UniProtKB/Swiss-Prot annotation:
The keyword Cytoplasm applies. The gene is zapD. SUPFAM superfamilies: YacF-like. Keywords: Cell cycle, Cell division, Cytoplasm, Septation. This is Cell division protein ZapD.
Amino acid sequence: MQTNRFEHPLNEKVRIYLRLEYLIRQMTHASQLSDQWQHQIFFRALFDLLEILDQVQLKTELAKDLEKQRCKLKNWLNIDGVDQNALLELLDSMDMAHHKLIAANRLGQDLRDDRFLSGIKQRFSIPGGSCCFDLPTLHHWLHLPLAHKQNDLSTWLSQLTEMTDALNLWLRFTRESGPFQPQIARAGFFQHTAEDASLLRLQICPSYGVYPMISGHRGRFAIRFIPFEEGATIADTIEFKLAIC
């Protein structure tokens, strides 16, 4: 059965992690295409990402969070029923990602120092500011041979590798820490406790014609399902699956 999946952070740090993951996915997808309009999406996502990195001390916080996860995983060693080989492999991956993150320069600094990127970044903050008369440099680049552009895009993405690897590991472990459980919302409303949780994951069948509005924090959260179509009625009961991570 097809389901729509939603995620909701329960603290500001996880909110930032999810936004970074979202932007990196946009960049990765756009970098693999030949369409110049997709390449402009790459730049917009990249500059949004750099804005976030300028506002938060991500490197320190992400390194701390990865180390906390590593300590939790170590407690599973020698526990019956745990795949020790898979666990050791994951611990090795975390050790490597943590080491590379700590050893890395300021996150995104090479991208900030790039002459071409720094020359076009400011115009992307203006609505419609990437037109050819605003950014002739960009439009020259957009018409370079595809191999040249893909090499540039790959280079820029690679300068975020340490952050991306650490972030992906942390989010993977966090998502896998909470299994999906069936739940029922009555009159479109559901609430529950979430002690020490950092992320909610929700699956719902699109045939209900609703989307979730989620509010909450580490201690408690509420979900209200809203009809997508104006004036539509909502089912008395809505079955969905929820993971508290």
